[in-house]
A protein has these predicted regions:
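Short helix-capping/linker segments at secondary-structure and domain boundaries
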Residues: 43, 65-74, 130, 201-204, ...
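A non-catalytic, helix-rich entry segment at domain boundaries
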Residues: 60-138
Length: 324
């Protein structure tokens, strides 16, 4: 009798590399920041007033959306008290920034009153004006296979569905002080990531998915301008993933370096607590200056990072000694 050998098929499947929009956006903003954060695992917490205030508004909007979705009365008294108490904490945490004017000419105190007096009612008013819409997603979580190698995961702030046409409207809540420029609305990568998620979540084709930013502090919404967001964005996403695969981590030096958590000038504690996270290629641009691309050290290659960082730290310590 002949022997039959059965070979089991291997079940070892390589897990997908998980990405969020914020992670791929970090690489797009600055490849070296991506390396420090995600490749080298230097996770630093960097609080700022914009993030704290934005998170608070998101929380209130989420509570209102759940009340509407569940056909429950919206307790504005409770929500306003919560908002006021949290704003007081923010004002105590950022006593200068809370009363400084932003590029819209308003302070956070003024934006607080604006939200309390009018913006807080926007979602309820919107739903009353559009009875054909229902809320189908609130902080809607998702995860999907992007290309067989990478997956995207995250959450969508808010999603509506037109009960007549089946169309999905994705809203991302932004507490921007002023609306975005048109150039920023052409095929935003964030919406491409969300549209691919929406297709799988609600079984709706791309041509029946619309995306827009909801701006409660500007009392408006802004729709993405591209007619085919996913097709326009995929080449960009593929190029970003290719850059990561090829370990192209050359820094992008801009005015945004001023707010970066890896900039030792604006986050000096990392010099002592986590020197391996110091970016030696940061821009010396400051709020009162215009030297956007002045840097202490010019980028050479990855092999020079440790030496450049050591030199950068020694120079900064010398500056501190001279000041003291």
């Amino acid at each position: 009798m002949s022997e039959i050998t059965i070979t089991e098929k291997s079940t070892d499947v390589k897990p997908l590399d998980r990405y969020s929009y914020s992670k791929i956006s970090c690489y797009k903003q600055c490849p070296f920041k991506f390396k420090l954060k995600y490749e080298d695992k230097n996770y630093l917490f960097s609080a700022n007033i914009a993030t704290d205030f934005g998170s608070l508004v998101h929380s209130i909007e989420e509570d209102i959306a759940y009340a509407i979705q569940n056909v429950q009365p919206i307790n504005y008294i409770v929500l306003k008290n919560k908002f006021i108490l949290e704003c007081r904490k923010i004002a105590q945490k950022y006593p200068i920034d809370f009363f400084n004017q932003d590029k819209s000419g308003r302070t956070y105190q003024e934006k607080m009153y604006l939200y309390l007096n009018s913006s807080i009612y926007r979602l309820e008013n919107f739903m009353q004006q559009h009875p054909e819409l229902k809320i189908v997603g609130i902080e809607q979580k998702f995860e999907y296979d992007y290309d067989g190698v990478h997956s995207f995961s995250g959450s969508i702030d808010r999603a509506f569905q037109n009960i007549i046409t089946g169309e999905i409207i994705i809203q991302d809540i932004k507490t921007w002080s002023v609306p975005a420029q048109n150039s920023e609305l052409k095929a935003p990568l964030q919406f491409a990531v969300y549209m691919m998620a929406a297709e799988k979540l609600w079984g709706v084709p791309f041509n029946k998915i619309k995306c827009e930013y909801d701006l409660p502090l500007c009392d408006t919404t802004q729709a993405a301008l591209s007619e085919d967001i996913v097709s326009d964005s995929k080449p960009v996403l593929d190029k970003l993933f290719k850059g990561i695969q090829q370990e192209n981590f050359k820094p992008t030096i801009t005015a945004l370096c001023h707010w970066c958590e890896y900039n030792p000038l604006t986050n000096p504690c990392i010099l002592d607590t986590k020197p391996e996270a110091v970016c030696p290629y940061f821009s010396t641009w400051q709020k009162s200056g215009d030297n956007v691309r002045d840097t202490l050290i010019a980028w050479k290659d990855l092999s020079s990072v440790a030496i450049d960082r050591q030199f950068c730290i020694s120079q900064l310590r010398q500056q501190m000694t001279n000041i003291n």
